[in-house]
Amino acid sequence: MKIVVSDCDHASMRIEEKVLADAGFGYEHHACRTEDDLIAKCAGANVIMTQYGPFSDRVLAALCPDLGLIVRYGVGVDTIDLDAATRLGVQICNVPDYGMNEVSDHALGLMLALVRKIPMITNSTRAGEWDYRMSIPVRRIKDMTIGVLGVGRIGRLFALKAMAFGGRVVLCDPYKPDGKSRVPGAEQLPFDDFIAAADVVSVHCPLSEETNGLIGAPEIARMRPGAFIINTARGGIVDEDALAEGLASGKLAGAGIDTVEVEPLRKDSPLRALDTCLVTPHMAWYSEESANELKRKVAEEAVRFAQGHCVTYPVNRPA
């Protein structure tokens, strides 16, 4: 059984190495970034553990029939051609239940920092000012409607935390638009009503054909004046040009983003120059505990497959 880590930028592989070694397996570790890298370095692999590798139809076809499993370090699997993997008999797995508290906390932190204007007033104080009026206007969070777009594990957790402020929380699930509320005390709305009602839209849905560009210029135009957008999910869900325009025009009061369409955020992005936009470098998932959990679960999934057991986190059903 050949197990390969195609790419991983973590500082240490100690946890994976121990999990694999305890089960009697070794592994190869590469730094593949391109399709050609994957084809050359992962040839003959039965199991691949990957972080960012672009597993296109071409790559998967070249690695089959040896390849049986790809496990991704993370939740999203948009770097993998799922249709091709399913057709070619490759099992795809992710780790959907790690870092849930971290991501929901990060989204909540971005929201609080923006609504309370903490970065702005901190910069003012550092510049020698001492005047709360520099932050005017600031709204009371309890009187705001907090919207949660995507009601999976992280979205539900964010909604529960947001409800602690005592205000209205509304939900919208792009995959279950007519479903009942999955969070007691929160109201489920159709997308158009949701966009028009929310003072804060916190994005927690996966990136897919259905959600790519889900929030663009038309949607921002229908939002409440002075609304906020928080995105700790995937960059492509929110149109960055439309977001920048909404912030620059004052239609939006602020945005907090942890993911962008192309990472890292390009140096000439207008979002970098906007004081009302808080940008973090795709770190919402991170804490020491969540990083260790992720590494352990990826390696454990690889071991399960290698030993002929059922996987715990299947994303597809291979042919």
What are these regions (language model features)?
Residues 30-31, 73-74, 90-101, 192, ...:
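Short beta->alpha connector loops at strand-helix junctions that form conserved
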Residues 46-47, 69, 200, 228, ...:
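Short, Asp-centered acidic motifs that coordinate Mg2+ and/or phosphate
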Residues 151-152:
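Glycine-rich Rossmann-fold phosphate-binding loop(s) that bind the pyrophosphate
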Residues 88, 92, 226-319:
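Rossmann-like dinucleotide-binding domain for NAD(H)/NADP(H)
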Residues 1-93, 196, 216-218:
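An N-terminal-biased, well-structured beta-alpha scaffold segment characteristic
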Residues 88, 96-145, 157-160:
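Phosphate-binding beta-alpha-beta segment of Rossmann-like dinucleotide-binding domains, i.e.
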Residues 67, 142-145, 217, 226:
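Phosphate-coordination loops involved in phosphoryl transfer and adenosine-cofactor binding
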Residues 53-60, 174-270:
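Rossmann-like adenosine-cofactor binding region
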